[in-house]
Regions:
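Conserved glycine-rich Rossmann-like NAD(P)H-binding loop of the short-chain dehydrogenase/reductase
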Residues: 16, 30-40
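NAD(P)H-binding glycine-rich loop region in Rossmannoid oxidoreductase-like domains
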Residues: 48-88
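Helix C-cap/helix->beta junction micro-motif
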Residues: 61, 102-103, 149
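NAD(P)-cofactor binding segment of oxidoreductase domains
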Residues: 80-108
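Catalytic helix-loop patch of NAD(P)-dependent Rossmann-fold dehydrogenases
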Residues: 87, 91-95, 115-150
Length: 150
């Protein structure tokens, strides 16, 4: 399914993946691209850890879809700052799910191979996660919040 003429909110859009997703969707849609680091003029400030601001922006922009790319991805930083990793990667996604459920908006959540322990050569969608790092555990928490909310 190709989305056209939709309002799409993309969080965590400041990195390489965010730029690629933004460029893909902006062609045929009205995109609000956001990040906590406004390193590009097309980025709006949104912090997924702030549920009140997520509600406010979602009520005014009225997205048809929310794509959450927001994450702390630096493995060493996450290990040294586990609370911040869980608040950003886990609670941030939980906040998005709460807003999305309240306003009836579908959500796309980007996870990581880091939810697996690396014992197998290949993993499938339904393999049992076993994250070893704080980063993997925090992203897995985000997955669980997404599953729980939908």
């Amino acid at each position: 399914m190709i989305l056209t003429n939709q309002n799409i909110l993309i969080t965590g859009c400041g990195g390489m993946l965010g730029l690629a997703v933004y460029n893909t969707f902006k062609v045929n849609n009205n995109v609000l691209a956001s990040d906590i680091d406004q390193n590009e003029p097309w980025l709006e400030y949104i912090d997924v850890r702030d549920i009140e601001s997520l509600f406010k922006i979602s009520k005014s922009f009225k997205p048809d879809l929310i794509i959450n790319l927001a994450a702390l991805t630096d493995l060493e930083y996450c290990e040294n700052h586990p609370n911040e990793a869980f608040v950003t990667n886990g609670l941030g996604q939980e906040n998005i799910c709460l807003v999305a459920n309240t306003l009836n908006i579908p959500v796309v959540y980007i996870s990581t191979a880091g939810i697996f322990d690396g014992e197998k050569e290949y993993y499938h969608d339904f393999d049992v996660p076993n994250p070893l790092s704080i980063y993997g555990k925090s992203k897995y928490y985000g997955e669980l919040m997404t599953i729980k909310s939908h």
